[in-house]
Amino acid sequence: MTQNRTLSLILPAFGAAIIAALAQIIIPIGAVPITLQTFAVGLVAAVLKPREATLAATLYLILGAIGLPVFAGGGGGLQTFFGPSAGYLLAYPFFALVTSVLTHANTPIWKSFLAFVLGDSLVFVGGILSLHFLGKMGWSAAVAVGLTPFIIPDLLKGLIVALVTKPVLKALKNHSYFN
């Protein structure tokens, strides 16, 4: 097995671990706490190739589904996927895929930022849909609760991911996987 093949198996697990660890960091701002889950998904997506990034986000969901306490605040279990926040989580693999496809070592910071914003937008679409259909909220309430409080924090997360990605990829450039 080649070194890159080994890495393509290890990196999704490492990415899922990063997402799980950062999901436990909760910033209690206002009525709705901010977590670093989307920051982690965006960072993993910006650094890894699309396949590994998508697998990392999917593995994270599988670990949570089987009951490991990897979701925000130590949550886990299959019931999470039937609650009002299910759409946010289920959008993570799509977030990872889109962001990873649009980001690479030579991507300018502003394009990395836009890639994060585009991928993160999919998370908000999923979240608003699940708040509406599973949480029985009206559309306006779902947007007010599930999007509005997160706009500025997520733009900041996207900016940080964009600023951090280039130096991280530069540091890893000597490894063939990251070329």
Regions of interest found by a model, annotated:
Residues 1-54:
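Hydrophobic transmembrane alpha-helices
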Residues 14, 21, 78-125:
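Short helix-perturbing small/polar motifs within transmembrane alpha-helices
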